Amino acid sequence: MFNEQYKYLRTNVKFSGDVKSIVVSSSYFGEGKTSVAANLAKSFALGNHKVVIVDMDLRRPSLRNFFDIDTEIGVTNVVVNNMDYKLAISHDESIWDLDIIHAGAIPPNANELISSDEMKNFIHTLEDNYDYVIIDTPPIEAYSDAVALSAICDATLLVYRVGETRKSDLVKSVESIRNVNGNLIGLVRINEK
């Protein structure tokens, strides 16, 4: 996707209703979800919105590949130890209104942590302090985390890669989101590698 396409995606998200927290997921690994999440967050920030992107892929975190992370404190530290989320913030110096929270230490019980009341409180705190909360998750067909977060957050974007994602898997992922009353606001198509 090019920069203009992320502006288009940003505009579509903005006009999808009262949306603050957005889950970005895919059916499988390697479909481009983290890249879409990172670029969508940048696009919102460049559009003068206060944005935080959160790495909720607690088993295989990858936001460090897109941003310079200058703290070891992450989501797991904040949620498990009831810490102030501000201690986990890293800043992208090139984009004024973009904050980053990485996953933190890999927990032994990622799914339980994702589904906890403490996680819900963490997300709601971020919603109260940012215009947009972009959440990068593990793939839906690998773990149930994205589906659980879809039930908590305002909206979900599902990324798929042309030539790789099977239609049946995409349909299955859509159904998983809808089964928890998740608000699927769009499919993001990534062309073949």
Where in this protein do the model-derived segments appear?
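Short boundary/hinge segments that flank catalytic cores
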Residues: 1-31, 35-38, 45-50, 56, ...
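Alpha-helix C-terminal capping segments
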Residues: 43-47, 151-152
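Short amphipathic alpha-helix
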Residues: 37-40, 111
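P-loop/Walker-type NTP enzyme "switch/lid" segment
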Residues: 1-3, 7, 11-18, 26-31, ...
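Conserved beta-strand segments that form the floor/walls of ligand-binding pockets within enzyme
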Residues: 23, 99, 136
